[in-house]
């Protein structure tokens, strides 16, 4: 079961093999195994944060196109005041705008 769990976290087969070898060595490797789990937990937390940001973007785009469908056009939606957006989507729109500005500055 733990091997399946480690696979799902994205741990490499090389690292999973290392974990198995350490586990077979017994209690002398507890600290090393703990460190492996801590590192993999940090990797997974970073992936989850990235996925949450992606989900937030999709939520914003769903709202955007639902609003466009109700209005019959996408025109002007980007110019709506923050108060017109659901509160949870306001920081998402701000992040997307900042990213778009950064991209245009790089060009």
What name fits each language-model region?
Residues 1-107:
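Arg/Lys-rich, alpha-helical DNA-contact motif
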């Amino acid at each position: 079961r733990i091997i399946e769990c480690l696979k799902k976290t994205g741990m490499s087969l090389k690292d999973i093999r290392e974990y198995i070898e350490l586990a077979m060595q017994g209690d002398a490797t507890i600290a090393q195994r703990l460190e492996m789990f801590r590192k993999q937990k940090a990797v997974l937390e970073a992936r989850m944060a990235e996925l949450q940001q992606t989900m937030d973007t999709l939520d914003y785009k769903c709202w955007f196109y639902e609003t466009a469908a109700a209005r019959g056009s996408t025109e002007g939606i980007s110019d709506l005041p923050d108060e017109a957006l659901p509160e949870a989507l306001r920081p998402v729109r701000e992040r997307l705008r900042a990213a778009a500005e950064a991209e245009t500055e790089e060009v």
